């Protein structure tokens, strides 16, 4: 069970007479607005003499030209927005072949042109397969990434190109379809950090020509889908009470299935930042979740899951202790089943409060 978004007993600490607006809203971002402009608009739409909506942020930037799913976290939900920053994302894009722009999309200036070779579905399928899976991608100059404290697009606007280290990305699904003799449609599911503008340019090059994006729409972020969104104009047309019905719970961004139920006394203690011994409360499901997460943690640090099993089986007391002390984030709920935050729990039963919502 999740905490409701705008309960009257949740007063803002900055404005004690106001209700803190907390939750996640899925907005269909319109073309032409920056992601931050959409956030500012949403903050305004949830503001009232009785409601405080000053704290808000999105879970991953969309370019001004792009449309589609933009999850926005308000209030206490901002504590958990990073879970969606790391989530896989799906996009649908239109690539115009035959020309390249300085920004990689239709907002830029054409810098080069090339003839477009004939192509069919078989060729598009072959090209798509070349890009499936793990690879490295060099970020574009027109991006908000920083070098020496300065954003790359600031260098680009000054006509300066700087070296950018390639980044590891994974394309988990990709499909190319012909629209006409000059345009193709790209549908892709990719890992965080993927620039679809760069992908579009690379696809065009693989086809023997140049290309740039003329349309980009985000369809999915983690488990959030485009058909769950509300258009910004539609949200604005609603009275405040109806806008609030579109708020998802504060924990909507969290992709963690394991949960630990705490007594009222334990809830009070974790709210004060105290560690707890919960070894007797770790169910088989929770222990299994922690063990699996530890395996994944070790694998991410260049150890295989088999290696982690060997560590558990070893007679080396220090290594055995190390594995059992690795903290894993799980949900914390109270006796009524209401979400109260996240805690880091290890197999030795140690619970460290991590991110708690303010009741």
Swiss-Prot record:
Reactions the enzyme catalyzes: uridine(55) in tRNA = pseudouridine(55) in tRNA
Which keywords accompany this UniProt record? Isomerase, tRNA processing
Q: Does the keyword Isomerase apply?
A: yes
Please name the top-level EC class of this enzyme.
Answer: isomerase
SUPFAM superfamilies, sorted: Pseudouridine synthase
Q: In UniProt terms, what function does this protein have?
A: Responsible for synthesis of pseudouridine from uracil-55 in the psi GC loop of transfer RNAs.
Q: What is this protein called?
A: tRNA pseudouridine synthase B
Species per Swiss-Prot/TrEMBL record: Psychrobacter cryohalolentis (strain ATCC BAA-1226 / DSM 17306 / VKM B-2378 / K5)
UniProt lists the gene as truB
